[in-house]
Amino acid sequence: MGAAVFFGCTFVAFGPAFSLFLITVAGDPLRVIILVAGAFFWLVSLLLASVVWFILVHVTDRSDARLQYGLLIFGAAVSVLLQEVFRFAYYKLLKKADEGLASLSEDGRSPISIRQMAYVSGLSFGIISGVFSVINILADALGPGVVGIHGDSPYYFLTSAFLTAAIILLHTFWGVVFFDACERRRYWALGLVVGSHLLTSGLTFLNPWYEASLLPIYAVTVSMGLWAFITAGGSLRSIQRSLSCRRQEDSRVMVYSALRIPPED
C-alpha cells in the first residue's frame, strides 16, 4: 500500500512537469542548461531564507508557540520575496546571455528567445520547489500505513501531491509573466506576480482545511495559466491550429532559379 501511495502521489505531483520537460526541454541542450541554472538560483534563495528564519528562531523565545508560528509565516513571506528577487536576477543574467548569443551568431539572432527562456526558467523554479516541498512527504509514504490514526486527514498525501503540481505550474506561469513584465516595464504585472505568490504561500497555512487552501490555489493557477498563455502570444486560433495539427505556413518565398547550377559551356 505504501508503494502504491508513493508512486501515485509522485506521478500526480511531477507528472505534468516531467511531461513538459520531455516534450519541450530535454531535446535542446541550451534549454537544459537554463533549467539547471534556474534551479541553482532557486536553491540560493531558499538558503538565504533558511538562514534568516534560523537566526530569528534562535534570537527569540522558542517556548512561545504563538511567536514561533508567526515567525514561520514571516519566514515564508521572506522566502517568497527572495525567490522573486532571484527570479529578477536570473532574468538579468539571461538577458546578458541572450545578447552574447546574438552577437556570436551568424545572422545576429539568438538561438533561443526571451519567452522560451522565461518558460524554461519558470519550469526550473517550479520543479526544484516541488522537489523540496514534497520529497519528505513522499519518503513518509513508503513507511507504515499510519495516515489518519492520530486524527490526521487520510487525504494528506494526495492533497500534498496536487498542491505540489499546482505550485510547479504556477512557477512556470509566473516565469512567463514576470519576464514579459520586465521586458515591457510593466511594474503592475510584477506586483501581481509577487502578490499572487504571497497569496498562494499564505493559503497553505490553512491546511488541513484543504477546501479552503487547495481550491483557491487552483483558481489562482488557472488564472495565471490564462494570463501566461495570452502573454506568450496564444489565442483561440493557435489552439485550433494545434488541435488540428496544422503548422503555420511559411510566408517566405524561395527563388529556385537562383539555386540552379549554371549550364556548362
Swiss-Prot record:
Disruption phenotype: Full embryonic lethality. No live homozygous embryos are present after 11 dpc.
Main location: endoplasmic reticulum
InterPro entries xref list: Aph-1
Superkingdom, taxonomy of origin: Eukaryota
GO BP term, pick one: amyloid-beta formation
Regions that span the bilayer: 3-23, 32-52, 69-89, 119-139, 159-179, 187-207, 214-234
Any one GO molecular-function label of the UniProt entry: enzyme binding
Organism this protein belongs to: Mus musculus
Bilayer disposition of the protein: Multi-pass membrane protein
Pfam families: Aph-1 (PF06105)
Self-association and partners: The functional gamma-secretase complex is composed of at least four polypeptides: a presenilin homodimer (PSEN1 or PSEN2), nicastrin (NCSTN), APH1 (APH1A or APH1B) and PSENEN/PEN2.
UniProt keyword annotations, A-Z: Endoplasmic reticulum, Golgi apparatus, Membrane, Notch signaling pathway, Transmembrane, Transmembrane helix
Keyword Membrane attributed: yes
Cellular compartments annotated: Endoplasmic reticulum membrane; Golgi apparatus, Golgi stack membrane
Segments on the Lumenal side according to the record's topology features: 1-2, 53-68, 140-158, 208-213
Known function: Non-catalytic subunit of the gamma-secretase complex, an endoprotease complex that catalyzes the intramembrane cleavage of integral membrane proteins such as Notch receptors and APP (amyloid-beta precursor protein). Required for normal gamma-secretase assembly. The gamma-secretase complex plays a role in Notch and Wnt signaling cascades and regulation of downstream processes via its role in processing key regulatory proteins, and by regulating cytosolic CTNNB1 levels.
A GO CC term assigned to this protein in UniProt: membrane
Protein name listed in UniProt: Gamma-secretase subunit APH-1A
Cytoplasmic side: 24-31, 90-118, 180-186, 235-265
Family to which the UniProt record says this protein belongs: Belongs to the APH-1 family.
